[in-house]
Amino acid sequence: MRCLFLNTDEQIKEQIKTTFDLLTKVQNKKTIAYVDGLYSLKCGYESLQDFDNAIKYASEIIELINSGSVQYDDKYKQHMSDVLVSCYDTKARQGDFESFCIAMEWNRPIEKQFYLPRARLLKKHGVIQGVQDLIDDKLDLLVLNLPPRIGKSTIGLFLQALLGGMYPDESILAAGHTTGLIDSFYDEIINLITDDEYRYNKIFPNNKIVDKSSEYHFIDLNKKKRFHTYTYISIETGGTGKVQAERLLYCDDLVKDVEQANNPERLEKLYHNYTGTVKDRKIQRLCKDGVYRACPEIHINTPWSLYDVTSRVVANAKSEGNMDRVRIISIPCYDEHGESNFMYDYGKGFDKAYYRDMEVAEDPVIFSAKYLMTPVERDGLVFNRDNVCYYNELPADEPDKVVAYADVTHGGDFYSTLMTQDLLYKRYRCHITSHNAPTNKAKRDRILACQDDIRGIATERNTYRVYFKQPDKIKGNKQYQLAMKNLFGWNQNIAAQNKQHDDFPDSLAGMITNVLGGNKKVGTARSINAEKFGL
């Protein structure tokens, strides 16, 4: 449904006043007639280019219809649908990202739509608000660290389609890891603009593709330009003098894979390509708050490395000390309860079982980066799934001893007293003392000194070997799985210290040094009913 006003501005204003006066007298605001009156106001203000009021009435109509407040017969169903989508069109044209996504896919079956099946969780995770704030000039940098195949690149493509539609005379520059990736971006933007399955031509009826090149990866809307509406470049080759970023700099997966992430020289080259041929193509523009700023950046990313392009961009922003206009959204595949963060509606997304299966199948380092949003440097990793020892079943014999080791933050005396009292109350015979662990070595050095013991390597100085449960025996045991993840993710590189979870490897080193290793100043438990502790 399109709004047609052929009158002068003064006549339109008079019509608006008359309609407004009539609506103030309406008692029942749950009728089609009332909605049609609001729709008339929406169209009138849009004709006058009073977009604030147009959006106000469009939003009111959307709320009324979607809430189910308006009652109508089936014969009016199409009419109300037309009114509703026209309101989404109005908001989309003024930069409302969610309205644009809904309006674009209005004619698609819900099970084929991208946005609505994913909307609930994308909004919960702050992704949609982050994109909206970028559109509204509230952010200079938005980073989306999200697992594979949850729709992050499609979000970026819809964002490009919207901004290019709103500002066809300005330039959007997009970069990806290889030519193959930017080929897909180029093809999909053309698809969003031209395919009748989408409603782009209804939202932006005056926009047409007038020039494009699959070889040079550019698209121009409405007129040919030196700096194209859309330009796509590979980060490996960089840009040229004919590229510019005025409305948006879009960076999607600048690091191709873990092999590239593990090569410091290639990462350094990528970063210099980014700073020298991509980032330096940004120009200033007037923002909505009246301030001139360089165009914003969005990085859609897999956080492969502490030293990849996006991680360094974020580190630079943090070092400058002003994060008010920077937002990093990192959502792992699991929530705090171990459930999937991306089990979308209508059968979309992935459940917990899928991610658990991937966790077992994937290399822990790769899984950590791709699915847990934790950059882990393979160079410097000490422990991995293949260099520690495992057991399936405990020996049938009685254990020589059962020990527990706690590395407490605030000193051991108080905690050991409580433990001793509790065990004595339960009639256990035990000998427990506290002792300050050696502090003359850094945590990193303690762990490295015990690395052979943790791996289960027999040495002349020890009389024990350390074994862990087989990986398939700890499925569902969140604490054990987290402990092993921390062990395999521990990195000895100096740069990684204080940036990683090292409690488990440090506690193992403490147990080996202070209990198993024969530090005689530390007490040993002589008789414990292990069953009471679930051991």
Describe each model-derived feature in a short phrase.
Residues 213-277:
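Conserved RecA-like ASCE ATPase "motif II neighborhood" in helicase/translocase motors
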Residues 248-337:
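Signature of the SF2 helicase/ATPase Hel1-core->accessory helical subdomain module
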Residues 338-406:
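ATPase catalytic-site recognition across NTP-hydrolyzing enzymes
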